Amino acid sequence: MNIDDKLEGLFLKCGGIDEMQSSRAMVVMGGVSGQSAVSGELQESVLQDRSLPHQEILAADEVLQESEMRQQDMISHDELMVHEETVKNDEEQTDTHERLPQGLQYALNVPISVKQEITFTDVSEQLMRDKKQVREPVDLQKKKKRKQRSPAKILTINEDGSLGLKTPKSHVCEHCNAAFRTNYHLQRHVFIHTGEKPFQCSQCDMRFIQKYLLQRHEKIHTGEKPFRCDECGMRFIQKYHMERHKRTHSGEKPYQCEYCLQYFSRTDRVLKHKRMCHENHDKKLNRCAIKGGLLTSEEDSGFSTSPKDNSLPKKKRQKPEKKSSGMDKESVLDKSDTKKDRNDYLPLYSSSTKVKDEYMVAEYAVEMPHSSVGGSHLEDASGEIHPPKLVLKKINSKRSLKQPLEQSQTISPLSTYEDSKVSKYAFELVDKQALLDSEGSADIDQVDNLQEGPSKPVHSSTNYDDAMQFLKKKRYLQAASNNSREYALNVGTIASQPSVTQAAVASVIDENTTASILDSQALNVEIKSNHDKNVIPDEVLQTLLDHYSHKANGQHEISFSVADTEVTSSISINSSDVPEVTQSENVGSSSQASSSDKANMLQEYSKFLQQALDRTSQNDAYLNSPSLNFVTDNQTLPNPPAFSSIDKQVYAAMPINSFRSGMNSPLRTTPDKSHFGLIVGDSQHPFPFSGDETNHASATSTADFLDQVTSQKKAEAQPVHQAYQMSSFEQPFRAPYHGSRAGIATQFSTANGQVNLRGPGTSAEFSEFPLVNVNDNRAGMTSSPDATTGQTFG
């Protein structure tokens, strides 16, 4: 070893550039290991300048010699080197001894000054060698003790002759056969299998495997965030989080997908991208190829799936597929993908993608199989493929409605294109209005939106129909008592226009009945909220329904079945739909309408039910006259509003005089009691007429009113109205009556038992007769809908 070092120093110091390169080549071949080549390069870089001082050359030479000895000691005392290395070293040493004379010839040609330098160098080197040899035994013993452990890195020679560093992992986990460098790493890994977490947090009792994880977790409790972003000032517990956050400011994307070369700013996004885009795609291709191989083998053997196999559960059907395809680990990873497969032997349709709110997007992407897989069948049936359009349909989550898919006996590329799948995905597209109506919007004033809507899907649930019937019944029975809905007729803020009269509708719409229109001219109402007394009992409504459904006179053309009638209790005011009428039909409407409340609608609803009860009574004289028809009155309403959303029915007008709410329901609880035109109820609050009402043009005496009422009672075949003493309308109240109602021509007419009341109610002193003066022109229940053939009252 000493001879080699001396020769190396000699050739480097005395020779020229060419000699230095040749000596460097000799050192590479004759060195003990390839590390000597590295040392030769270092010597060349250090000693390339010929004018270096003598002491610097000696110091550099000493450093190189120490590094060589250290490397040689490590290699000699480690018995993990390959045997070829030692054989190669012996051969290289013999080659260096053969080439020594050539090297000495070059060294003899140097000048005298250089020779003196060489001899001086040899003496100094010898002194340094002697000192190191004295210390060598102690250093070797220490190094031997240290190297008895497993070395961190081992120098090895690769197959191509290059050097490599190998890290031995001698500590192997007995659970999963994972190897580790040290026992510490192994014990830390074993905690994962055993579940042991020795480090516990003192504040939240969380446990951790490593201590640094506990220390990092404790910063959450203390609120310490030592790492701060320079640009935005955000602070972080971990330095990694801060560095990741800084990439949002700089826009740096250091991570790249190895498949599509797309860059990402975070590693988790790269992994997610690979998992979603590339790994699943590769797995699908592998699965498709395996299924294609299965199909060819089954076609060659003439195998066809039996219906018994189709009736098996999905997991049991997948087991023989896994065994036959030989997918051991990939089948476990593909569980999420195989759940979407429906025994499809060919990938004709890609799996349907699930979107939010359980909407299914049906993707019909027909993939062409291989040429060896049923090519003749595909050519024959390719002209018949008509994939349905992409539609959005809210699917039903019930598994009981999913019909089992029946496979065809002869397996072909189009065996999975079945009628059941087509019916599952292909539905009619509904328009926006029908969608809004079908979603249960109670505030849309439509009459027959369910009857006019699109047909129901094939796999619709029957619970939806039950729910809709229940909603109809609840809306019919509780329309008057539901406090959550707002029935405020905000008419007081609307000024009366000269050609358009604002109207509010609070009515129950039926196929054969009319609605009641509130005249805004007469809505000078003072409302007192008394919700406890304004609720119509359910018994009363049920009695009415029973009465309408089971009439004794055999006239069943009027159906009040809850299941067949849709009740809309919303209020719509649309002044743009109100047509203009002539000036002769206008009545002076100078007073502004005041605001009303829910009680207003309740009372109108009660009055409408009472009038409907009068019309459908079995002894009522109105049912015996076939000439009655829907009645319109063009003299009382300046411009009758046309509500386009309520089936274009003709409405009877009902002027409302001033009254106060708070009355109980004026309906009778049983249908066999008497019904009368003036709604008389047992109310605790009278409805006095205010004396400051607008004076009108003409008035009708009370005597005319009494004559017409008595003539009506005589005209009836079987009178069902109770006889009330109407003499109270005589002289004591005639004068204030004429003074207060002089503006409107109050008209009373009788025709076939109907009374058109356009007169006022009682005065303030009659508390025993709380007359609600809202009787409209009753619509006749006849079969002819033509209004011109009927009788017009007024």
Swiss-Prot record:
Tissue: Expressed in heart, lung, kidney, skeletal muscle, liver, brain and spleen.
GO biological process assignments: gamete generation; negative regulation of DNA-templated transcription; negative regulation of gene expression; negative regulation of transcription by RNA polymerase II; positive regulation of transcription by RNA polymerase II; protein-containing complex assembly; regulation of transcription by RNA polymerase II
Covalent cross-link Glycyl lysine isopeptide (Lys-Gly) (interchain with G-Cter in SUMO1) as placed by the record, residue numbers: 356
Biased composition annotated in UniProt, kind: Polar residues: 574-588
Localization: Nucleus
PTM per Swiss-Prot/TrEMBL: Sumoylated with SUMO2. Desumoylated by SENP3, resulting in the stimulation of transcription of its target genes.
Main localization of the protein described in the UniProt heading: nucleus
Biased segments, Basic and acidic residues type: 321-344
Cellular component, GO annotation: nucleus
Entry-annotated residues carrying Phosphothreonine: 194
Positions of modified residues (N6-acetyllysine): 607
Zinc finger (C2H2-type): 171-193, 199-221, 227-249, 255-278
Residue span of region Disordered: 298-346, 574-596
Keyword Acetylation: yes
Residue location of crosslink Glycyl lysine isopeptide (Lys-Gly) (interchain with G-Cter in SUMO2): 6, 88, 115, 132, 291, 308, 356, 402, 421, 424
Modification Phosphoserine, positions: 51, 250, 301, 306, 412, 665, 784
Keywords, sorted A to Z: Acetylation, DNA-binding, Isopeptide bond, Metal-binding, Nucleus, Phosphoprotein, Repeat, Repressor, Transcription, Transcription regulation, Ubl conjugation, Zinc, Zinc-finger
Pfam families given in the database record: zf-C2H2
Record-linked Gene3D superfamilies: Classic Zinc Finger (3.30.160.60)
InterPro entries according to UniProt: Znf_C2H2_sf, Znf_C2H2_type
GO molecular-function terms, A-Z: DNA-binding transcription factor activity; DNA-binding transcription repressor activity, RNA polymerase II-specific; double-stranded DNA binding; RNA polymerase II cis-regulatory region sequence-specific DNA binding; sequence-specific DNA binding; transcription cis-regulatory region binding; zinc ion binding
Function field: Involved in transcriptional regulation. Represses the transcription of a number of genes including gastrin, stromelysin and enolase. Binds to the G-rich box in the enhancer region of these genes.
Subunit structure: Interacts with HNRNPDL. Interacts with the 5FMC complex; the interaction requires association with CHTOP. Interacts with CAVIN1.
Protein family according to the UniProt entry: Belongs to the krueppel C2H2-type zinc-finger protein family.
Name of the molecule in the record: Zinc finger protein 148
The organism of origin for this protein: Rattus norvegicus
